[in-house]
Swiss-Prot record:
PANTHER family tied to this protein: TR-TYPE G DOMAIN-CONTAINING PROTEIN, TRANSLATION INITIATION FACTOR IF-2-RELATED
The protein's name: Translation initiation factor IF-2
Keywords, sorted A to Z: Cytoplasm, GTP-binding, Initiation factor, Nucleotide-binding, Protein biosynthesis
Superkingdom of the source species: Bacteria
InterPro entries, sorted: EF-G-like_DII (IPR053905), IF2_II (IPR044145), IF2_N (IPR006847), P-loop_NTPase (IPR027417), Small_GTP-bd (IPR005225), T_Tr_GTP-bd_dom (IPR000795), TF_IF2_bacterial-like (IPR000178), TIF_IF2 (IPR015760)
Stretch list, region G1: 381-388
Segments of this protein annotated with the region G5: 521-523
The gene coding this protein: infB
Molecular-function annotations in GO: GTP binding; GTPase activity; translation initiation factor activity
Residues covered by region (G3): 431-434
């Protein structure tokens, strides 16, 4: 159905336009004025709200049908007879019970004398593209006026009125049009349309032929079979100056001044109060991160365009499909009476998995399906307190020798066998970095662990990262076992460590607490068995470590990196279920099929049960460290989950990056001047190290004049795309334990891109901080060189006034900047030592305690007792 204007529908429904406008506002539709168009669904609602009035009963059902009235007599000559129209008597109203003439009268003979009998059945005329509904039936919608230039605007269906039949005028018989082709339906043409009823038309009877739309000899067709007759006014057609007769479309009624004023008011620009939106009463609306106004409108059942206008009045320039930040959504919700709640990422992910009938984080089956599993132990502590050495002693390996700088750069997961009185038992160890830059990695390690082993050096005691690791373990609500390491070193004091940790709530068992302290030496192996026993005792006493191995595997990706030959490789920890080769797996935004699994020694593994760390090959991309992984029934489901997660994260980032910029911000930037920006591209061997490096670099603060911007980061070797991006954005590439490819190296040398390589994280931080300080404008400070007191003034025609001085402190240097101070007041500033002499000899400097002659160039206002201070501006190093 085509669009209809409000005033047209009002005429059709026989109501006023303002009544329809009020109803539209009740329905929540924003309509400016009566000339606005409305959509088909809205028209349907209005028709239901304003049903047509009941129609009067008609005899034999014929009065309700508009019959094809005979047209006025037309002259075939060039002259018309307006006098006959003027002399026509008034029309006589025919009773409704009168039978239509078209049903009983046969057509007379045509010009050739051939008689064609009118059959009693109607002949169906060819239908135009959009047929109009019959008048007796409730109209479903007015047809749109065509593009025919010979037709006048169609009249709107009105309640049936008694048929007016004008009296015939003698002497003016209608001259019929010759037929196009006997027996063939005529094509609807402008001249063949049903004529407009007019006064002065003769009633059909003897001697008056019946004018048919398709030509002579055709029976009258029902009006619903063709287009409503609105034919153009032909020659000799009766009517007024514009062909309006009694049956023509009524002219537009004259509007009062009040009505015109109301229409003018409706044409004004809409304001926020004029937008009809469903108002809330404090209802809670839950929206995901990065939701758009269309999502909000769908929740409250409103038009997105209306929300765009409301947001515009609130000072937000957004579109209906643009991701909006949390503050804007809450502001808009408060304006409309709703409480907007942004769904957390955890709830979003849970709802996403529930849509696929996947439940994350629970064991399936009853108690009988649960079996014991090994404890997962995370080793945490301050940097260089011997965590990796301790694990080496437990595993009898040498992992620390392979770490750059002796500092663990990423998480390592291992499973070891501990010999106990009840037999061998498995323990899974997770080694987390202790450097301050790896805070996020320590937090992840605490979240996936069962027991935290806090390593504290007996000689150093409690350090900053020790406290941070302790807080992570407490936040994860896991039991803590303290390993006091390096007890073999001179100056070791385990008792001091116990006393320090008491301040943080860890009271040793020997002091009446519930925390187990074990003195160990990773170097000599002392206390290793006691530490393993303490871990198992804590697990048996405080934890119920059971899981169901007979379900699809679920767990967490501890670490991931990109291998040149094997592709993305992720170190995962299975928490429940069993992971097998060939399973479809999804971890965060990465998905794939498990092609192979390797243990910590590089040996292939066919399946991994609960608490087992393995390396998984087969992901399509590198998952982020800390992403949960799960096995799904098929690859299609894994792909859909990953794509939806990626789209959700992209919308959240778009919403976060959209920042409101005010005039105050612009003025502030103008006052500060151009901000220097150091652009970086980070590439690393594992995703956790790249994340830690980025977090550490972004924490560098050298003031408001310079800042760091990481434009790209990734895992794997430095590629040509990274170099081209650095060229386009004038960035520096930092490779952490990675090197560039052959062509990438050549391209970087050719384009002059600065590529830095690091294997220890704090070296990268120091270099970037130095580079960032180099972007700052230099800061100078004044350094005083010396002072000289004027004892005598000598006047020279060649050099001007010469001050005979005694150097009181420092050194007076020729060419240095100077100022003249008289009685504590500076009388001359920014002058220079133009000449410096000692006993008629030109010298470059005069030290303290010696006399000299000083010339200050053009400044000659020198008096006895003045003090000449020399100084220089030196660049101040950035702290």
């Amino acid at each position: 159905m085509a669009k209809v204007r409000v005033y047209e529908l009002a005429k059709e429904l026989n109501v006023e336009s303002k009544t329809l406008l009020a109803k539209l506002h009740e329905l929540g539709e924003f309509v400016r004025s009566a000339s606005s168009t409305i959509e088909a669904p809205v028209v349907r609602k209005l028709r239901e709200a304003f049903p047509p009035p009941p129609e009067p009963a008609a005899g034999n059902g014929s009065a309700a049908q508009p019959t094809a009235k005979p047209s006025a007599a037309k002259s075939t000559g060039k002259t018309t007879e307006p006098a006959a129209d003027a002399a026509a008597p008034p029309a006589v109203t025919t009773p409704p019970s009168a039978a239509p003439a078209g049903a009983t009268t046969s057509a007379p003979s045509d010009a050739g004398g051939e008689k064609i009998a009118t059959p009693p059945r109607p002949v169906k005329l060819p239908q135009p593209p959009r047929p109009a509904p019959a008048v007796p039936k409730p109209p479903s919608g007015p047809p749109r006026m065509g593009n025919n230039p010979f037709t006048s605007p169609m009249p709107r269906p009105m309640p049936p009125r008694p048929v007016q039949r004008p009296t015939g005028t003698p002497g003016t018989p209608g001259i019929p049009r010759p037929p196009l082709r006997p027996g063939a339906p005529g094509r609807p043409t402008p001249g063949a349309m049903p004529p407009r009823p007019a006064a002065g038309r003769a009633a059909p009877g003897r001697g008056a032929p019946i004018r048919l739309p398709g030509g002579l000899g055709r029976a009258p067709a029902p009006p619903s079979a063709g287009r409503p007759g609105v034919g153009g006014r032909g020659r000799g057609a009766p009517g007024g100056a514009f062909g309006r007769g009694p049956g023509a479309k009524p002219s537009r009624p004259h509007k009062s001044k009040k009505q015109r004023r109301q229409e003018f008011d409706n044409l004004q620009a809409p304001v926020i109060g004029g937008i009809q939106i469903p108002r809330g009463n404090g209802q809670v609306v839950r929206l995901p991160r990065g939701a758009s106004l269309a999502d909000f409108a769908d929740k409250i059942g409103a038009n997105p365009a209306s929300l765009v206008q409301v947001a515009f009045h609130l000072g937000e320039m957004v579109t209906a499909t643009q991701s909006v930040n949390e503050e804007t959504l809450q502001l808009l919700g408060a304006e409309l009476g709703y409480e907007v709640q942004i769904v957390s990422p955890e709830d979003e992910d849970r709802e996403l998995l529930e849509s696929f009938d996947i439940e994350l984080g629970t064991d399936q089956g009853d108690e009988a399906a649960l079996v014991p599993r090994p404890p997962v132990v995370t080793v945490m502590g301050h940097v260089d307190h011997g965590k990796t050495k301790l694990l080496d002693a437990i595993r009898n390996t040498n992992v620390a020798a392979r770490e750059h700088g002796g500092i663990t750069q990423h998480i390592g997961a291992y499973q070891v066998t501990a010999q106990t009185a009840d037999g061998p038992r498995q323990i899974t160890f997770i080694d987390t970095p202790g450097h301050e830059a790896f805070t996020a990695m320590r937090a992840r390690g605490a979240q996936v662990t069962d027991i935290a082993v806090l390593v504290v050096a007996a000689d150093d005691g409690v350090m900053p990262q020790t406290v941070e690791a302790l807080n992570h373990a407490k936040a994860a609500d896991v039991p803590i076992v303290v390993a006091v390491n390096k007890i073999d070193k001179p100056g070791a004091d385990p008792v001091k460590v116990r006393g320090q940790l008491t301040e943080y709530g860890l009271v040793a068992e020997e002091y009446g607490g519930d925390t187990m302290f074990v003195d160990v030496s990773a170097l000599t192996g002392q206390g290793i068995d006691d530490l393993l026993e303490a871990i198992l005792l804590t697990a048996d006493a405080a934890l119920d470590l059971r899981a169901n191995p007979n379900q699809p595997a679920q767990g967490v990706a501890i670490e991931a990196h990109l291998d040149r030959g094997r592709g993305p490789v992720a170190t995962v920890l299975v928490q429940r279920g069993t992971l097998r080769v060939g399973d479809s797996i999804v971890a965060g935004e990465a998905f794939g099929r498990v092609r192979a699994m390797l243990d910590e020694f590089g040996q292939p593994v066919e399946e991994a049960g609960p608490s087992r760390p393995v390396q998984v090959l087969g992901f399509t991309s590198v998952p982020d460290a800390g992403d949960t992984f799960l096995v799904v029934p098929e690859d299609r489901v894994a792909r859909q989950i990953a794509e939806r997660r990626a789209a959700r994260e992209r919308n959240a980032q778009l919403a976060a990056s959209r920042r409101r910029r005010t005039l105050e911000d612009i003025l502030e930037r103008m006052e500060k001047g151009e901000v220097a920006e150091l652009r970086l591209i980070l590439k690393g061997d594992v995703s956790g190290s790249v994340e830690a490096l980025e977090d550490a670099l972004l924490k560098i603060d050298v003031g408001d004049e310079a800042r760091i911007r990481v434009i790209d980061r990734g895992v794997g070797a430095i590629t040509e795309n990274n170099v081209m991006l650095a060229v386009a954005s004038d960035a520096i590439i930092i490779g952490f334990n990675v090197r560039p490819e052959g062509k990438a190296r050549e391209l970087a040398e050719r384009e002059g891109v600065d590529v830095r390589y690091y294997s220890v994280i704090y070296q990268a931080i120091e270099d970037v901080e130095a580079a960032l300080k180099g972007l700052l404008k230099p800061v100078y400070e004044e350094v005083q060189l010396g002072t000289a007191e004027v004892r005598e003034v000598f006047r020279s025609s060649k050099f001007g006034n010469i001050a005979g001085c005694l150097v009181r402190s420092g050194t007076i240097t020729r060419g240095a900047k100077a100022r003249v101070v008289r009685d504590g007041v500076v009388v001359a500033n920014d002058v220079s030592i133009a000449s410096l002499r000692r006993f008629k000899d030109d010298v470059t400097e005069v030290r303290e305690g010696f006399e000299c002659g000083v010339g200050l160039g053009s400044f000659n206002d020198i008096r006895v007792g003045d003090v000449i201070e020399t100084y220089e501006m030196r660049e101040k190093p950035r702290s």
